[in-house]
């Protein structure tokens, strides 16, 4: 399961790059608000809440108990968030390897206490109930 999710994340990284390269349109405000709310939970270290607020595809790709170990391992060494600036937001309806739908790819430039310059990418999906939820989260 972990290998499958890792392959999904790598493929998604290529998708994010491709979608941005082809100049998709800007994100709706409600998607931006959902992304910022999800990141605020991650900033507090609330892995359980981030998993519950994630999209079904995310939950299918990673079990809650695994996510509750993975997020702290990725975020704690970075320290607290000092600043975060939205670099870009792009909408798309197609991404390789995932079902067609409404997606927004957010890229943030983030400064942490232990890493002054990091790039965060957050992929949001508008689910059938009309709510924007996180499908993927990446830190470089």
Positions of predicted regions on the chain:
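Short, low-complexity N-terminal intrinsically disordered segments enriched in polar/charged residues
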Residues: 4, 18-46
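Bacterial N-terminal signal peptides
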Residues: 7-17
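Second-shell loop/turn segments in exported
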Residues: 22-25, 36-39, 54-59, 109-111
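Short solvent-exposed beta->alpha transition segments
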Residues: 32-33, 48-101
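Exposed beta-sheet edge and beta->alpha loop/turn motif
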Residues: 89-140
């Amino acid at each position: 399961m972990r290998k499958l999710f890792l392959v999904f994340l790598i493929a998604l990284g290529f998708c994010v790059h491709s979608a941005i390269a082809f100049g998709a349109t800007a994100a709706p405000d409600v998607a931006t608000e959902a992304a910022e709310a999800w990141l605020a939970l991650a900033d507090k270290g609330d892995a359980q809440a981030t998993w519950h607020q994630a999209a079904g595809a995310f939950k299918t790709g990673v079990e809650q108990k695994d996510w509750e170990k993975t997020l702290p391992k990725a975020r704690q060494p970075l320290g607290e968030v000092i600043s975060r600036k939205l670099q870009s937001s792009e909408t798309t309806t197609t991404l390789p390897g995932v079902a067609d739908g409404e997606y927004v790819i957010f890229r943030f430039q983030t400064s942490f206490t232990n890493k002054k310059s990091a790039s965060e990418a957050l992929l949001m999906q508008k689910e059938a109930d009309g709510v924007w939820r996180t499908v993927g989260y990446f830190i470089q």
